[in-house]
């Protein structure tokens, strides 16, 4: 994944002071503040990163005699950089402006404070450069947890999601879930075209926020638990104690997985709701229901 300089300019509302080379792409979300480089130190210089000049670097350059400033800036421009951004609406020094034109480098300006701009551009690049995949399923926010419901086509994922929405939970995505890995966290969202829509077989597509209100949908959600729905298979040894530790890898990130068998008479939505509540409980509790039962058995045995 790569992001063009033109995309950054458009999405971050940057002013172009000097237009650089066409076709420059960014593959890193990190930034570099070139204060050390202006001081003459070039070891470990991240020249492949976006260069951000804040008030500190700008003031340092301003304090230099003109001949020293030109020498330092010219040495800095010997290294290829994707773009230079002046934060806080700062006015570029003449030497910086002249070298940007001479070396055909992008020189941009942001009105935002330096720290805020850095956070903004890093979040933007993290999102755009994050590894991504699309999974067939339904993503629902239940008790603040992102529950990804998967399973065979026609198993009842969307119908289950509809029941969960009626119970006050929120839909993130139906049918197709776009998932990105950002700093080892999986974030799921709906493709733009199907955002807020839910397909129910025999009924068609329904507009969830139109029927249930804007609070019934969410734009994106971290994925905490995967629940796989399958038809009940006789003879299969399903987990009855909650001790199975099954995981699935999405974008090489392990996620807790539960397999939920479906058969007539089971209220799947209620079971998933309980599974989410139990998962949240287990995150904070050191004592599982199995431990409690074992303790009671031990107490009963000692009493006898």
Curated annotation (Swiss-Prot):
Residues that bind ATP: 151-158
EC number: 2.7.11.-, 2.7.4.-
Keywords for this protein: ATP-binding, Carbohydrate metabolism, Kinase, Magnesium, Metal-binding, Multifunctional enzyme, Nucleotide-binding, Serine/threonine-protein kinase, Transferase
Nucleus keyword on record: no
Binding site for Mg(2+): 158, 199
Cofactor(s) the protein needs: Mg(2+)
UniProt superkingdom: Bacteria
Subunit-level organization: Homohexamer.
Name of the protein in question: HPr kinase/phosphorylase
Organism: Clostridium acetobutylicum (strain ATCC 824 / DSM 792 / JCM 1419 / IAM 19013 / LMG 5710 / NBRC 13948 / NRRL B-527 / VKM B-1787 / 2291 / W)
Encoding gene (name): hprK
């Amino acid at each position: 994944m790569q992001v063009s300089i033109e995309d950054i300019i458009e999405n971050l509302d940057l002013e172009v002071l000097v237009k650089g080379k066409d076709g420059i792409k960014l593959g890193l979300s990190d930034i570099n503040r070139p204060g050390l480089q202006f001081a003459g130190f070039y070891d470990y210089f991240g020249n492949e990163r976006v260069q951000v000049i804040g008030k500190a670097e700008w003031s340092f350059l301003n304090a230099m005699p003109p001949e020293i400033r030109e020498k330092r800036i010219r040495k800095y421009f010997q290294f290829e950089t994707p773009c230079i951004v002046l934060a806080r609406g700062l006015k570029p020094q003449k030497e910086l402006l002249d070298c940007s034109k001479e070396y055909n480098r992008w020189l941009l300006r942001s009105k935002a404070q330096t720290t805020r701009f850095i956070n903004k551009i890093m979040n933007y690049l993290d999102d755009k450069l994050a590894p991504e995949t699309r999974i067939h399923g339904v993503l629902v926010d239940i008790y603040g947890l992102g529950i990804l419901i998967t399973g065979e086509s026609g198993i009842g994922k969307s119908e289950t999601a509809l029941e969960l929405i009626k119970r006050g939970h929120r839909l993130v995505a139906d049918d197709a879930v776009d998932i990105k890995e950002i700093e080892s966290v999986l974030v799921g969202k709906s493709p733009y075209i199907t955002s807020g829509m839910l397909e129910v077989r025999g009924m068609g597509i329904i507009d969830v926020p139109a029927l249930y209100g804007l609070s019934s949908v969410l734009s994106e959600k971290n994925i905490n638990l995967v629940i796989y729905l399958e038809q009940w298979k006789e003879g299969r040894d399903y987990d009855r104690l909650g001790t199975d530790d099954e995981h699935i890898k999405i974008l090489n990130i392990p996620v807790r997985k539960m397999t939920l068998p479906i058969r007539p008479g089971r209220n799947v939505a209620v079971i998933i709701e309980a599974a989410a509540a139990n998962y949240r409980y287990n995150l904070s509790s050191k004592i599982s229901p199995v431990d409690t039962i074992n303790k009671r058995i031990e107490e009963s045995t000692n009493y006898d």
